[in-house]
Amino acid sequence: MARTGWTSPIPLCVSLLLTCGFAEAGKLLVVPMDGSHWFTMQSVVEKLILRGHEVVVVMPEVSWQLGKSLNCTVKTYSTSYTLEDLDREFMDFADAQWKAQVRSLFSLFLSSSNGFFNLFFSHCRSLFNDRKLVEYLKESSFDAVFLDPFDACGLIVAKYFSLPSVVFARGIACHYLEEGAQCPAPLSYVPRILLGFSDAMTFKERVRNHIMHLEEHLFCQYFSKNALEIASEILQTPVTAYDLYSHTSIWLLRTDFVLDYPKPVMPNMIFIGGINCHQGKPLPMEFEAYINASGEHGIVVFSLGSMVSEIPEKKAMAIADALGKIPQTVLWRYTGTRPSNLANNTILVKWLPQNDLLGHPMTRAFITHAGSHGVYESICNGVPMVMMPLFGDQMDNAKRMETKGAGVTLNVLEMTSEDLENALKAVINDKSYKENIMRLSSLHKDRPVEPLDLAVFWVEFVMRHKGAPHLRPAAHDLTWYQYHSLDVIGFLLAVVLTVAFITFKCCAYGYRKCLGKKGRVKKAHKSKTH
């Protein structure tokens, strides 16, 4: 018998999905961050363009990657620095990581990174000095701003034009995420950045965690001083970091609880960890040939990210020596000077299709700096890691993966050739590392919505509703003592003390009355006996 109606929900779901595909077109302003930050943000922007939205990207004329191959309106503005200045400051910053690992905000403040960050911060002043561009943005009637908060310029733009904003970030430095979202972060089990602690901290680590929290309040204002001065100049009023971050409508955070430790979250914090992962593509013939030639031993993928172009000669030779002692073929993304002791099993390449190689069944291990992009590609493809973190959240990412048994962490500044060799043999030959990373991969992929689709939904949500005020906690409207209920505690303490005082006075009065009466009785009794 022919069916006269839909008895299955599948056609209805397909119909709804198709209907959702035709979103009501909006107008979005994008203020991105250069470098690797742009790679994943670009995927969201491209999908929003495909869904029919009018997207305008505002970027400096001097940049590495911004705005390339985008089918949308790109508005540029001149900067006070050249590409050579940018490259020089970045190289100084990158080279400094091979001298000492930054594990406190005080050492970061004293390091050479200040010049690099201040260069990035300065371009926002250039944006607002372009009066023609500012006038264009003012007249464009955008629905929202999609921004990377690293250099604060997107936050300044959102506040200047009074637009709802969607923040796109792995995490936020200092205490700005907790303050901006009014999200609690108990220091007893939520480790601060740079420390590389797990959520099961010893007493000594908890003490250090509290000290780091104090450091954030002491030194972050100095670290962000240049950005806040520019913001105050543009907005023509004194501005704090809280003033900028607290108006965020939605926080799109490139993490999840497969990588991160469980902790409190707020309703406007959306987790899109793994958004950079994608289905593996066929490998270029060159790399397919390398894999075929590797035989049964397979390959090891080695990349320290775009940040590292040169490794000190002595360290590079120690690494090359270790790589030559394993039977696998090593594909090493490296643009520096070729180590003189490079073994036949190690192939240097200037670029490699990292995600596609990690997705190949012959890949045995991944040597990485533990940047969030690489870590998630490793999780998605189920490849155990040897992690050599250098800076920022890399130490924290590495600790999280090591805690979960998915890899081994080495101190790249102190490790020897034997350390790297032993770590590689451990993650390749010990099946527990592969089993653990496959378990994490299964957990990560078991989700109702893909991270990219989730990110696109929330950007469109903010565009449709002009923000998300219903998700904004009332904590933003409280003073610090109200937030911590110090006024309530003080009131209740006063009540308890008042009651205790009155009770004490009543008891003392009764006691005196009783003693006085008893004394008179005794006195009367004595007089009668005489």
UniProtKB/Swiss-Prot annotation:
Changing A173G: In allele UGT1A8*2. Homodimer. Homooligomer. Interacts with UGT1A1, UGT1A3, UGT1A4, UGT1A6, UGT1A7, UGT1A9 and UGT1A10 to form heterodimers. Isoform 1 interacts with isoform 2/i2 suggesting that oligomerization is involved in negative regulation of transferase activity by isoform 2. Isoform 1 also interacts with respective i2 isoforms of UGT1A1, UGT1A3, UGT1A4, UGT1A6, UGT1A7, UGT1A9 and UGT1A10. UGT1A8 isoform is part of the UGT1A complex locus which displays alternative use of promoters, first exons and terminal exons. The locus is defined by 13 first exons, which are alternatively spliced to 3 other common exons and 2 alternative terminal exons 5. From the 27 possible mRNA isoforms, 9 produce functionally active polypeptides (UGT1A1, 1A3, 1A4, 1A5, 1A6, 1A7, 1A8, 1A9 and 1A10) called isoforms 1 (i1). Use of an alternative exon 5 (5b) as terminal exon is leading to 9 additional alternatively spliced products termed isoforms i2 and which lack transferase activity. It catalyses: glucuronate acceptor + UDP-alpha-D-glucuronate = acceptor beta-D-glucuronoside + UDP + H(+); 17beta-estradiol + UDP-alpha-D-glucuronate = 17beta-estradiol 3-O-(beta-D-glucuronate) + UDP + H(+); 17alpha-estradiol + UDP-alpha-D-glucuronate = 17alpha-estradiol 3-O-(beta-D-glucuronate) + UDP + H(+); estrone + UDP-alpha-D-glucuronate = estrone 3-O-(beta-D-glucuronate) + UDP + H(+). Keywords: Endoplasmic reticulum, Glycoprotein, Glycosyltransferase, Lipid metabolism, Membrane, Signal, Transferase, Transmembrane, Transmembrane helix. Belongs to the UDP-glycosyltransferase family. One of its GO terms (cellular component) is endoplasmic reticulum. Its main location: endoplasmic reticulum. SUPFAM superfamilies: UDP-Glycosyltransferase/glycogen phosphorylase (SSF53756). The gene is UGT1A8. One of its GO terms (biological process) is flavonoid metabolic process. The chain crosses the membrane at residues 488-504. It comes from Homo sapiens (Human). It is a single-pass membrane protein. It is found in: Endoplasmic reticulum membrane. This is UDP-glucuronosyltransferase 1A8. Residues 1-25 form the signal peptide. Glycans are attached at N71, N292, N344. Gene3D superfamilies: Glycogen Phosphorylase B. Its EC number is 2.4.1.17.
